[in-house]
Amino acid sequence: NYDMGMDGASPLFAGACTEPQKELLWQKLQSPEHLWCACGLSTVDQSAPYYRRDGYWNGAVWMPYQWMFFKSALDAGLVDFAYRIADTALTLWQNECAESYCCFEHFMIESRRGAGWHQFSGLSSPIVQWFSAYYRPGTLTTGFDAFVRHTDWAPDNSTLNATLDFTAAGRSTVLAVLQPGSKAVTASVPCTVTTRHDGLLELTFALDAPCTVTISIHP
């Protein structure tokens, strides 16, 4: 793959990769020598000959494409990497807003500061979605390969019943944010449940084939 930009890794969320290709691309995305940096995913592999320290595109961090790879990480069951993308972006954005009170277009990798137009609110949508995905009770978040057919939340968001259609086999993670407190989880197929913080449940399924899954989460 001679395309060392983020679009070179886009076959991951297009479903166009072989298993060896998936493994290699995920390695590159998580490697600090390639696409991962202290403030998120670089637009261009940091080892690329056309990577620029002062780049507008070829050497910066933008939020929208990171949302795409966050969703793909959920599809791949890479729950820790999905969280790393979201948490890094939220921290970066919060630090810049506290310092400048601006809503910047993109971020420079070396300085970790906002750059470009300072009132570019349209690119802030992923920030709002990441916050909701991890911290807003009443939020259910999936990757691209899961379709939420039905949800039934308790009025206080302490209970959730949901039906999801998974369109691909393999590992896949779903995030559910409920009111804090201990929860019991039942599902129509086996799943692994982790609690990153009180109220957030990360449900990871290992699916043999595309299928419909029902989930019940309650105190």
Label every PLM stretch briefly.
Residues 31-39:
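Mobile, glycine-enriched helix-loop/loop "lid" segments at the mouths of ligand-binding/catalytic clefts
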Residues 38-62:
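Generic long, charged, amphipathic alpha-helical segments
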Residues 189-195:
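Surface-exposed loop/edge segments in extracytoplasmic proteins
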Residues 165-181:
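Surface-exposed beta-strand/loop patches in extracellular or lumenal glycoproteins
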Residues 158-166:
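Short, well-ordered beta-strand segments enriched in hydrophobic/aromatic residues
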Residues 196-219:
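C-terminal beta-strand-rich structural cap/linker in extracellular carbohydrate-active enzymes
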Residues 1-32, 55-157:
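C-terminal capping/lid segments that line or modulate ligand- or cofactor-binding pockets
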